[in-house]
Design a protein with these regions (language model features):
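Short coil turns and loop connectors of transmembrane beta-barrels in diderm outer membranes
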Residues: 58, 104, 114, 146, ...
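Bacterial N-terminal signal peptides
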Residues: 15-28
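Alpha-helix capping and helix-loop boundary segments enriched in small/acidic/polar residues
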Residues: 275-276, 287, 319, 371, ...
Length: 858
């Protein structure tokens, strides 16, 4: 077992910076050495389907016409085949593509023949929004590593979508490049003419290049998807199935430099007991993107505005665990794949830790105090890329500023660093990698009693495919260490991630400790291709493993074993276009072997010929003996009772003007004493080709007979009362989005989510014999009023976003967000009409933001 107890994790901000700067400084030198090596040879098993790019002496005019000289000489790519719904079928209409290039750009002209051009579906939307529209997509593997690539897609209305592909099939939909495309609908069908600057993609330095390439076409009205070369859904991966693009000679290797300065004006009003608090702020910042080499890019940002366009979803968390929130900030979203560790992009690096809400705001007692929702990011930089040898590199460094209210620190200045490297072998079929994260906080005496001062985590991961890509092995070994005062480490030991103080845990709880270390082991084996797939995995998290300073970890002290099997019918049959069935078995234990969870699951999915979908999932929890080690929130483990669940999702044909969907779930447990049912209808209405409205509703009724209520007394003492109650909870929320697109460069989006949940606690009990076989013997009555613990929580989040790309890469955003909260009326009483009326009458907080950026390309 890997131990970190003797590792000195202490490091200062200066040392952190030096580590990152050293990496940034040395990698390009190594890159030049590696780039001089020959490109990786492909194995004989790789498809030889290829196309040749024609050199262009004069750049074509990007207008969607094929009257430029290059299109007269370039060889046409033909032979597109259907891959969905039928694999290797004959296409309804022909498709052709021609490819040219010069030292600065790739040029691609595509002709989508259609016998009925007046029936071509062409919908206008914001950039990167997928609609039920015709589409042509160009996928380019410029490293020719069969694992990564860039995707450029457009529909007949000229709406652009672009992605970065990694791990052979995963997509980073947030990647945005600056490129041109023009489309036209004519008597033969429609066309798309692309200009893709080589500065926007990455490739090794060489006299002659071979890129991987695939072109796909969607014909929505016939529910058909075609590709060249043929993409086989029965095989694992996408980039590994690309054809070859040859003939690329003399490509430039520019040291790309892009600068995007911006100005932001922000006005905030927040309700206070004595009125409204108002603040206005103007800031200036900028983003920089520099091509250190042809395949390494440095991104930097100074004084960034990292506002979220949509608010996080409203919810009331009654569990012991932190809520995971999705990242929506472009700087951190782009390049996510490089920082993924063994397929998990969050356990070691959860980017929302950077700029998080102040952690010590609860120390401020003044109700009129202005407490910011986020911590300012003073600056951030990252270096990412992939070398000719198959080495992927990613480093990130960020500094957030100190936040204080008066003399009370609510968030310290913090330095963050992430270093990730991985090496591919066997043309990407195998690989090993390593990752290290570092956090350092500048704490005063009060904050040092609550927050950890230093944190380091790291690990190695590996993957290996064999049997012509049908089978895979993967694994990782990680370790962590955190340091701080005895007070801060004691809080760490007692939080829900660890619960060292649980009386029957048998863990070495020590309130005088000033550090904790731990390890993580993961092993996986899978059959990943073919009609039948299956696999198994084992993971162990030691009690002291801790990554939450820069990662996301809900629970340590856990072993998980799981197995699954799946059968997929990818060819159309009499009753469906495609269908699948999966079975799962999962068992969890503490690190010391106490069984905590087991569940068995069956999932069924069908897509019918009319494009309707139906999925049904059913699972049973804790049919075998298990003990919940988190239910008593630091108390003893409680015998878990079985529950049975069913989830149904029904989706309509996505092509009509009105598209309804429905999801419903039902749960019964605690021998019928606990029930939950939830229904979520959703409808999308597209009244015009550029106007859509989405409305969703969620209603939930939860009767939980074993809801944790509280612990009275010192946790772990003989006199502690571990209290549980019956919770009767109702929840109602609405989600609405309105999208209007005036042009491909100008759009308006409105978002609103009113949220209401109420709950009453009754039948209060305390643990008596928590591991008793009989449910009735585990608890005994406890006499204490519960009325004060009832709740009525109401929230409203709205946002209006106007986005105008007034020139390529340059945008103006106008954003208005509003929030309303109310929790002090009608506790325990559920009356939606009354409650939403009260909510809309509550005083709002408002934020109006205007941001303008200007993209400069050198």
């Amino acid at each position: 077992m890997l131990e970190l107890g003797s590792i000195n994790a202490s490091f200062s901000a200066r040392k952190t910076a030096l580590v990152v700067v050293a990496v940034l400084a040395t990698v390009p030198v190594g890159a030049q050495t590696i780039q001089a090596q020959a490109a990786v040879e492909h194995s004989a098993s790789v498809s030889v389907t290829s196309a040749t790019a024609a050199p262009s002496e004069r750049p074509p005019v990007i207008d969607g016409r094929d009257d430029d000289p290059i299109w007269k000489t370039a060889t046409a790519i033909t032979g597109f085949r259907v891959f969905d719904p039928k694999e290797d079928g004959e296409p309804t209409f022909e498709t052709e593509a021609k490819i040219g290039y010069d030292a600065q750009n790739l040029y691609i002209f595509t002709r989508m023949f259609d016998a009925h051009p007046d029936s071509i579906i062409s919908l206008l939307s914001r950039r990167d929004v997928k609609t039920e529209s015709e589409q042509i997509k160009i996928m380019i593997d410029s490293y020719h590593d069969r694992r990564t690539g860039y995707e450029f897609a457009v529909n007949p209305a000229g709406v652009k979508r672009d992605y970065y592909t990694y791990d052979d099939s995963r997509e980073d939909i947030t990647w945005d490049a600056v490129w041109d495309v023009a489309t036209r609908i004519d008597s033969l069908g429609w066309t798309a003419e692309f200009r893709i600057p080589l500065s926007q993609i990455r490739y090794p330095k060489a006299a002659e290049h071979t890129f991987g390439i695939m072109i796909t076409r969607d014909i929505v009205r016939t529910s058909e998807r075609d590709s060249w070369p043929l993409y086989r859904r029965s095989k694992r991966g996408i980039a590994s199935q690309f054809g070859d693009l040859t003939g690329l000679r003399g490509l430039g290797s520019p040291h790309r430099l892009e600068i995007a300065p911006y100005v932001v004006s922000k006005n905030v009003s927040v309700p206070r007991p004595d009125g409204f608090g108002r603040a206005q702020k103007q800031t200036v910042g900028g983003d920089l993107k520099y091509g250190v080499t042809s395949n390494l890019t440095l991104d930097a940002t100074v004084n960034p505005d990292f506002g979220q366009v949509e608010a996080d979803p409203a919810q009331l968390n009654l569990t012991a665990f932190e809520t995971f929130l999705a990242e929506q900030r472009p700087f951190f979203l782009e390049g996510t794949g490089i920082f993924s560790f063994n397929g998990d992009a969050s356990r070691m690096f959860y980017s929302r830790r950077i700029g998080r809400a102040p952690q010590l705001s609860g120390l401020v007692s003044d109700p009129n105090a202005d407490i910011p929702a986020t911590t300012p990011i003073l600056g951030a930089a990252k270096l990412t890329g992939r070398l000719a040898s198959g080495t992927s590199l990613g480093t990130l460094f960020a500094v957030t500023g100190r936040q204080a209210v008066g003399s009370t620190m609510i968030e310290p200045q913090t330095e963050y660093a992430v270093i990730r490297a991985s090496q591919d072998f066997r043309n990407g079929e195998s690989g090993v990698g390593t990752m290290v994260t570092l956090v350092n906080r500048q704490l005063d005496d009060a904050a040092a009693q609550r927050l950890r001062r230093e944190a380091v985590s790291g690990g190695i991961d590996m993957r290996h495919r064999f049997g012509e890509g049908r089978y895979s092995l993967a694994g990782s070994l990680g370790a962590s260490v955190v340091r701080g005062t005895a007070g801060a480490i004691d809080r760490t030991q007692r939080n829900a991630v660890h619960y060292y103080n649980r009386p029957d845990a048998g863990l070495p709880y020590d309130s005088s400790r000033t550090s904790i270390s731990g390890t993580n082991l993961l092993l996986k084996a899978d059959k990943v291709a073919g009609t039948l797939t299956y696999g198994a995995s084992y993971e162990r998290l030691s009690p002291g493993f801790e990554t939450n300073d820069l990662g996301f970890l809900a629970q340590a002290d856990q072993q998980t074993g799981q197995a699954y099997a799946s059968i997929q019918s990818s060819q159309p049959r009499a009753f469906w276009r495609n269908a699948s069935a999966q079975v799962y078995q999962v068992n969890q234990f503490t690190a010391n072997g106490l069984p905590t969870t087991n569940f068995s699951e069956l999932d069924l999915y069908t897509e019918f010929h009319n494009r309707m979908t139906l999925s049904v999932s059913t699972w049973a929890d804790n049919v075998f003996t298990a003990y919940c080690d988190r239910c008593a929130r630091g108390g003893p483990a409680v015998r878990a009772t079985p529950d049975v669940n069913m989830l149904i999702n029904l989706g309509a044909d996505p092509r009509p003007m009105v598209v309804p969907t429905l999801a419903a779930i039902y749960t019964v447990g605690d021998f019928g004493r606990t029930t939950l049912w939830r229904v979520r209808p959703y409808v999308t209405v597209r009244s015009r080709s550029n106007l859509s409205w989405e409305l969703g509703t969620r209603y939930q009724r939860n009767r939980n007979d074993t809801q944790w209520f509280g612990n009275l007394g010192a946790i772990g003492s003989d006199t502690t009362h571990y209290l549980f109650a019956h919770l009767d909870q109702e929840l109602l929320s609405f989600t609405s989005r309105l999208n209007y697109t005036a042009t491909t460069a100008l759009s308006v989006q409105l978002y609103a989510e009113p949220f209401l949940t109420t709950g009453r606690y009754f039948r209060l009990r305390e643990l008596a014999s928590p591991r008793a076989d009989r449910y009735e013997d585990r608890y005994r009555p406890f006499d204490m009023p519960t009325d004060a613990a009832s709740f009525n929580v109401k929230q409203l989040h709205t946002s209006t976003v106007v986005r105008w790309e007034y020139r390529p890469g340059s945008t103006v955003f106008i954003v208005w967000t509003q929030g309303r909260d109310q929790e002090d009326r009608n506790e325990g009483s559920f009356a939606p009409t009354r409650d939403f009326r009260d909510l809309f009458g509550a005083r709002p907080d408002n934020t109006v933001l205007v941001k303008a950026s200007y993209w400069i390309n050198f």
